[in-house]
Swiss-Prot record:
UniProt PTM: Phosphorylated by GSK3B.
Gene: GSKIP
One cellular component term from this protein's GO annotations in UniProt: cytoplasm
Transmembrane regions: none
Keyword terms of this UniProt record: Cytoplasm, Nucleus
Disulfide bonds: none
Subcellular localization(s) per the UniProt record: Cytoplasm; Nucleus
Gene Ontology biological process terms, A to Z: intrinsic apoptotic signaling pathway in response to oxidative stress; negative regulation of protein kinase activity; positive regulation of canonical Wnt signaling pathway; regulation of Wnt signaling pathway
Record-given protein name: GSK3-beta interaction protein
Provenance organism: Macaca fascicularis (Crab-eating macaque)
UniProt-annotated stretches for the region Interaction with GSK3B and acts as a GSK3B inhibitor: 115-139
C-alpha cells in the first residue's frame, strides 16, 4: 500500500485540506527549500523516531537536506528539491554522490518504501482520525 497523504490533515471524509504547503512540487515558484523541509518534517514526525532539517549541510533556495531515523532505527539523509525527495545517504548528514536513488513526489511515498513501521503508524493514525470523524458525525 502506497500512502500519499497525511492522515492528520484530513479535514472531512470527502477530502483533504486545501492550500497545504505540500500539495505537490510542480508549477511552484522558487521556494526557500528550508521552509519546505520544515513543513515536511512537521508532517511526518509522528511516524518516525527522529527527523530534522540538517544544520551542517548547505540549504539554499533550491535544495535542503533532511535527516530521518525510521522506527526500524535506519538512518537516512534525504535531499529535497523541486523534483521531490530522494535518499542521498545512509546516515545523518551524509551525502554519497555516487548513490543512485529515485525521486519521490511526496515524503509519504518515500517513507512508504523505506519503513514498514511508517506504513503501520500512518495507517493507525488514519484509522484514528476516521473514527474520530465518525464519532463527531454521530453526535
Amino acid at each position: 500500500m502506497e500512502t500519499d497523504c497525511n492522515p492528520m490533515e484530513l479535514s472531512s471524509m470527502s477530502g483533504f485540506e486545501e492550500g497545504s504547503e505540500l500539495n505537490g512540487f510542480e508549477g511552484t515558484d522558487m521556494k526557500d527549500m528550508r521552509l519546505e523541509a520544515e513543513a515536511v518534517v512537521n508532517d511526518v514526525l509522528f511516524a518516525v523516531n527522529n527527523m530534522f532539517v540538517s544544520k551542517s549541510l548547505r540549504c539554499a533556495d533550491d535544495v535542503a537536506y533532511i535527516n530521518v531515523e525510521t522506527k526500524e532505527r535506519n538512518r537516512y539523509c534525504l535531499e529535497l528539491t523541486e523534483a521531490g525527495l530522494k535518499v542521498v545517504g545512509y546516515d545523518f548528514d551524509q551525502v554519497d554522490d555516487h548513490l543512485q536513488t529515485p525521486y519521490h513526489e511526496t515524503v509519504y511515498s518515500l517513507l512508504d518504501t523505506l519503513s514498514p513501521a511508517y506504513r503501520e503508524a500512518f495507517g493507525n493514525a488514519l484509522l484514528q482520525r476516521l473514527e474520530a470523524l465518525k464519532r463527531d458525525g454521530q453526535s
